[in-house]
Amino acid sequence: MKKQKISDDDNNNPFDAISHEIVFLILDHLLPHSLDVKSFSLVCKSFYSIESLHRRHLRPLRTHHLPSVLSRYPNLSRLDLSLCPRVPDSTLHVLSSSPSLSPSLRSIDLSRSRFFTPSGLSSLALRCSNLVDVDVSNATDMRDAGAAALAQAKNLERLRMARCKMVTDIGIGCVAVGCRKLKELVLKWCLGVGDLGVGLVAVKCRDLRTLDVSYLPISNKCVPSIVKLPYLEDLFLEGCYCIDDDGLAALKDGCNSLKTLDISSCQSISPVGIPSIGSGYASLKRLNLSHGIPVTFALVTGLKKLSMLQTLKLDGCMVTISGLKALGDCCASLTEISLSKCAGVTDEGLSYLVTKHGQLKKLDLTCCRKITEVSIAHITRSCTALASLRMESCTLVPKEAFVLIGGRCAYLEELDLTDNEIDDEGLEYISRCTRIKVLKLGICLNITDRGLSCIGASCPELIELDLYRSAGVTDAGISSIARGCPNLEMINVAYCNDITDTSLTSLSKCLSLNTLECRGCPLVTSVGISAIAGSCRQLTKLDIKKCGNMDDSAMIPLAHYSQNLRQINLSYTSVTDVGLLSLASVSCLQSMTILHLKGLTASGLAAALLACGGLTKVKLQMSFRSMLPHPLLNHLEGRGCTFHWRNKVFQVELDPKCWKIQLEDNNTLQ
């Protein structure tokens, strides 16, 4: 292994004797933590140089400094520009003409970028000969000429064009002819593409493994071409309303390699077509039938031959007891079932299903409002290896049932109990699930600090906690979580009225915290947010809406320390022009919601918007639209910023119990 020379000028720095290969291995371990990599590069000149050589992936916020950045990182292979709202042709020309980048670039992400044209895409496709992965999703202005430009990338293997609504069969035909090596093509919501374009892709791109044509106006005509793809593994037909039973029957004549099939929201498919799936796809592992036909005994009988099926999604379907029982008697390899918002799920059918599928790892019962403790008893007795259980708004499940979850499902990593009757005793048992990483307890009005203290004492791996509108939680409970869960990344304490700055000061010890939602906490002030800003340097999302005591003094430390902040909601706070303008120094800031700020003036808002150069999305009160100069708005929109104007009337916040009663009434009406 090559070693660096040690010069007298370096005073025999021991780090210089370490080979590049060993240092590269160290950097590989640091890669998930960008701040650690940055700290590493600042240790010494040698490490700075090595980090530059090691980096393969770059995700800049702006394109202005790309020329100098490219000279520092000569070995880049993946460039993610999704955070750059404005990527003009001049930027793409710089990339494609770079002597170091053009031969090494293999992947570029333009999925949230705008302002490039066919000229820039053509330059990229022609000069970056090793380009294999391009994402231009959301390029709603791109037309066939842009697709034709991309078609010049002869080695392209993955192309994502979701929501490119102006592209037609002509553009996709160019892609099909030019990019013969494609293995993945995403055309979801490309409304101008029909049977002709999809058929051409299927005929010309024989190596396709993944094809997503969801919500395209295609019919059965293109199915015969699709079924002839010899290596197709993942086919997404969500929302293709013109594909019916005949089209599904045609699919069974080929696609022997198919592993994933999504026919959710395909309204023209009836129970008659489902047996085609069972007889044609022996290797199928993932099937999505959500928002489609009723799950009856006859339908499930058609799936009996899917012996390798592992994931089945039936979200939003009407299910019957006989259908659930039939599902229990087939598909023995199932490890994941989703019944979210399925009408008709009862104890009898669900209990039989889970008893027969004890190997389940993921179960989604969101809004299955008819199940009781009977179902929970069967789930916890049979599916002891569950890693994820979602049961939001299962309102007939009594508090005693949650004891069973904690007592029997020790391997849980994700648990969603939003809007349930769980109490402190239930949380005490849930704390036995020591591997839990995601815990959602929103609108759980029976829990208090006592239950949370059990979670804090026993669940050190917790990274996400949702306590939205759980009114019994106070500073003591949050402090317990902060002490016991040092790796916490996300917490939601919105509308927990008794939360004060003490909670935020405690949470400031969680150095990995990146998302804090404390809207509607009237006792929280700028002191607490200042503590968060000073310690939680990875903070990216902050919601302090309706925190009336939050003023400009909180914005100063945020501007100074929270340089990774990307999204902030300041609505209904006491922040003024001064505080808003101070946020201009946060170069990462992209999304801002500022409704009903009494101290905000039109001139102050204009200055702040102009100074915050990275903004891509701003929500504003409609009244400001006529106050801001039109040339200013045009300039900001040209910079890549989108404005969302709201005519929202100030609303008085309801008591948590009144709010839940109102929510239950709405659910009953639905």
Each language-model region and where it sits:
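Conserved "Asn-ladder"/turn position within leucine-rich repeats
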Residues: 84, 113-114, 139-140, 164-165, ...
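N-terminal adaptor-interaction module of cullin-RING ubiquitin ligase components
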Residues: 1-180, 184-189, 194-215, 219-227, ...
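Leucine-rich repeat domain C-terminal region
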Residues: 589-600, 610-670
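Structured C-terminal portions of repeat-based eukaryotic scaffold domains
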Residues: 509, 530, 538-541, 545-612
